[in-house]
């Protein structure tokens, strides 16, 4: 889903605030020699050890935390041995264990309390590693240092305890120093989150010298680049206060984000990280609806009731998040495509395409028309008809095709046109109720005369404060007509209901929430096309229309 050219806020990856530009000065100081030489990680390991309050021999610099996790399993999880871990967890933990050909033993538990007894019950002579995240991803919960020490003390000496502490700076407790006293423990740290250096891929394994020495043999000798080491080292020497200021900002804003989520029907989990996990009745709607508005959040297929949202990094981002969530809960306006959403055009516009093609000797079935519409760039039925004829080898101008189409649709002389078969899909009562709550608008590719006539004939014209037609702006999928509708309605947030990928793409480009509508008689093909185009939700016009706004 691509929200046009608007700025996208990515709150799906838990990345930190970008560091100050001053950190780039180090590259200028080093010059091109930094790129020529193989990089020595020892100064970085010493600086990070000093930051943690331990010896350099207890620290191994790795290519991000993922590399550290991978090394732990390659070193301490033999093929066929078991990795015991509370679940859900960071996906790279089980992924790396599988790559080492280890067997997974997941432990379901009540989030927030370390399942000490369940973990110990699962440990056997085949156990190689017990893996724990604190604070946890994706739940955001943290385990107490005491509970970790109690678990470590109870594990057999040959079992390695891996504690992923990627979010430790954001938590109330940092168990690093306590776990450094546990010979079998290895901690995973990173500069991707609180330090804002995810692009450098700088991580660390921290533990007893004997364990760290073992890990050194399970990776390349130059795991980090010279620029990565130089910038990370500079941040450790000059950026600690900056990092801690950002951490305090996140801690102060977590509850604000949780409050916003509660206001729109979410149930947020307590968090000690830089993100909040929240459950919703329809989490997929939240994720896709926010993406359409240019705010990316994380949805988990294995946790289908939840979305995870990184704490916005400044007030401007917070306002975008609040507006996007508010729109999903209660938009200012509802924008309707006409054909297939308000008007049942199976026996009018769609049939006009069929009969116009037939008049040129070409058979065009409804399945073909559905496929053309689903492919996109098909909001102009005159152009669609001309394209079908051209594909069949008919040499006719667009003007000729349009004239024939209009004869069929409008009627000629004593021959009534197909437009007489058009009916209103939603009831007038439903539209009237919506008009009492929202500003309503129509965004259609129809000529104004046809659109206005249909609305008058169906006695609903007075319910729509804006009717945008082909004369007003470029046709969808261009977002321009949607933006014109927003301007005329004086609305900042809206849902756009449409039955084609062009409607969805126009909505996304304009920053409004696209709701796909499967028109009467539509099948699975239309549903799939709407979903692939980025519809945040899909409903069937003749069954779900009213319920969409009352669920």
Q: Model regions: which residues?
A:
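Short, acidic loop-to-helix structural element flanking the phosphoryl-transfer center
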Residues: 411-442, 448-452, 479
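N-terminal helical cap/lid subdomain that shapes the substrate entry/recognition surface
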Residues: 332-338, 342-429
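PLP-dependent aminotransferase class I/II
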Residues: 20, 184-262, 266-268
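Acidic, Mg2+-coordinating phosphoryl-transfer loop and its flanking beta/alpha structural elements
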Residues: 496-539
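PLP-dependent aminotransferase-like
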Residues: 75-132
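Active-site phosphate-binding strand-loop segment of PLP-dependent enzymes
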Residues: 111-171
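N-terminal small-domain helix-loop-helix segment of the aminotransferase-like
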Residues: 1-67, 71
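Conserved PLP-binding catalytic core of the aspartate aminotransferase-like
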Residues: 250-251, 258-293, 311
């Amino acid at each position: 889903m691509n929200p046009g050219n608007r700025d996208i806020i990515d709150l799906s990856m838990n990345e930190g605030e970008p560091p100050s530009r001053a950190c780039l000065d180090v590259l200028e100081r080093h010059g091109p020699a930094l790129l020529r030489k193989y990089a020595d990680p020892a100064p970085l390991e010493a600086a990070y050890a000093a930051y943690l309050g331990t010896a350099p021999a207890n620290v191994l610099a790795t290519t991000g935390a993922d590399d550290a996790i991978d090394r732990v399993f390659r070193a301490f999880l033999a093929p066929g041995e078991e990795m015991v871990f509370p679940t859900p967890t960071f996906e790279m933990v089980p992924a790396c264990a599988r790559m080492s050909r280890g067997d997974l033993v997941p432990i379901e538990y009540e989030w927030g309390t370390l399942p000490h007894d369940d973990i110990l019950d699962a440990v056997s002579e085949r156990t190689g590693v017990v893996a724990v995240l604190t604070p946890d991803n994706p739940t955001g919960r943290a385990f107490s240092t005491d509970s970790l020490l109690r678990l470590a003390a109870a594990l057999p000496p040959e079992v390695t305890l891996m504690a992923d502490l990627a979010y430790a700076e954001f938590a109330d407790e940092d168990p690093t120093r306590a776990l450094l006293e546990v010979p079998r423990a290895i901690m995973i740290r990173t500069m991707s989150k609180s330090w804002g250096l995810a692009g450098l891929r700088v991580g660390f394994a921290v533990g007893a010298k004997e364990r760290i020495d073992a890990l050194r043999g399970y990776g390349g000798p130059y795991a980090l680049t010279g620029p990565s080491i130089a910038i990370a080292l500079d941040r450790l020497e000059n950026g600690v206060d900056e990092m801690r200021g950002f951490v305090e900002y996140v801690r102060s804003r977590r509850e604000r984000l949780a409050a916003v989520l509660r206001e729109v029907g979410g149930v947020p989990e307590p968090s000690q990280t830089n993100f909040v996990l929240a459950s919703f009745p329809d989490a997929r709607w939240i994720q896709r609806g926010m993406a359409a508005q240019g705010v990316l959040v994380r949805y988990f297929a294995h946790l289908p009731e939840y979305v995870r949202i990184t704490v916005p990094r400044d007030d401007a981002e917070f306002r975008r998040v609040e507006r996007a969530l508010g729109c999903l809960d209660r938009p200012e306006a509802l924008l309707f495509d006409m054909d297939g959403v308000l008007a049942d055009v199976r026996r009018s516009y769609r049939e006009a395409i069929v009969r116009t093609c037939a008049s040129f000797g070409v058979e065009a079935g409804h399945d073909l028309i559905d496929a053309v519409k689903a492919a996109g760039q098909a909001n102009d039925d005159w152009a669609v008809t001309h394209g079908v004829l051209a594909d069949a080898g008919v040499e006719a101008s667009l003007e000729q095709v349009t004239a024939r189409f209009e004869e069929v649709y409008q009627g000629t002389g004593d021959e009534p046109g197909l437009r007489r078969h058009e009916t209103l899909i939603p009831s007038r009562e439903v539209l009237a109720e919506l008009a009492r709550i929202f500003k309503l608008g129509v965004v259609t590719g129809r000529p104004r005369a046809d659109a206005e006539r249909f609305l008058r004939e169906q006695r609903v014209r007075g319910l729509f404060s804006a009717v945008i037609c082909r004369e007003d702006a470029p046709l969808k999928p261009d977002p321009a007509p949607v933006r014109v509708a927003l301007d005329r309605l004086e609305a900042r947030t809206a849902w756009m209901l449409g039955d084609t990928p062009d409607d969805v793409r126009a909505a996304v480009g304009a920053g409004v929430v696209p709701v796909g509508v499967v028109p009467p008689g539509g099948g699975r093909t239309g549903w799939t096309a709407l979903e692939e185009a980025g519809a945040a939700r899909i409903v069937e016009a003749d069954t779900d229309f009213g319920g969409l706004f009352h669920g």
